Amino acid sequence: MDPNQKITILINSCDNYEDLWVPFFTLFKKYWDPKDVRILLNTESKDFSFNGLSIECIHPKNINDPYGARMLNALSHIRTPYVITLLDDFVLRNKVDQDLINRIIGWMDNDNRIAYFNCDYTKTFIDFEVNKYPGFKRIPNGNEYTLNMQAAVWRTKRLIHYWRPNVSPWEWECFTNLCAAKNKTDKFNRSVKFIL
């Protein structure tokens, strides 16, 4: 199966940041051509379109829902095993390495314990699987900010598992790592270079 049929791109935003959408999607279109990949824009109530991209806006049932509820609602619209998560201010500056994304999906297909590949650089004291995933390190559960809101390729079911309806992104980054520390089966991989 084509790796693009296994992923959805989820851009998380809010109505108040709609002024970021045109620059974000201008550079998105310039530096990435994710053929046949669903692109979802998670926001409260506004709709948005951009020439040359098929963007589906996802809105919560209640626009006053907390961020966590909005995130879970958006994730419920994803029908693929993997989701690439981005925030509206993660502006692309270079061409996205689609071959690397395809390799990541292959690695995740081959090891169900991998929860995600994060594109954030981290100083990891231990790499449990040296050179198994070139350009990435496996970081220990419970490491500070093991899970965070940086650009990442997530196993959709695991991302849903780690979210709670009443949390903000900042609370999620802090408190979810406590949950991750208890889960000894999930593997978390963080980049030593940026792909997005």
PLM regions and their residue ranges:
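Short beta-strand-to-loop acidic/aromatic patch adjacent to the donor-nucleotide binding site
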Residues: 81-91
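Conserved donor-nucleotide/metal-binding helix-loop-beta segment in metal-dependent transferases, i.e.
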Residues: 95-125
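Catalytic core and acceptor-binding pocket of nucleotide-sugar-dependent glycosyltransferases
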Residues: 146-196
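A structural signal for short, well-ordered beta-strand segments and their strand-loop junctions
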Residues: 40-41, 83-85, 115-120, 153, ...
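A broadly used, surface-exposed interaction patch
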Residues: 58-75, 82, 95-96, 101-104
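Short, flexible, basic/aromatic active-site loop/helix in glycosyltransferases
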Residues: 129-144
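N-terminal anchoring/stem segment of glycosyltransferases
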Residues: 1-63, 75-77, 81-82
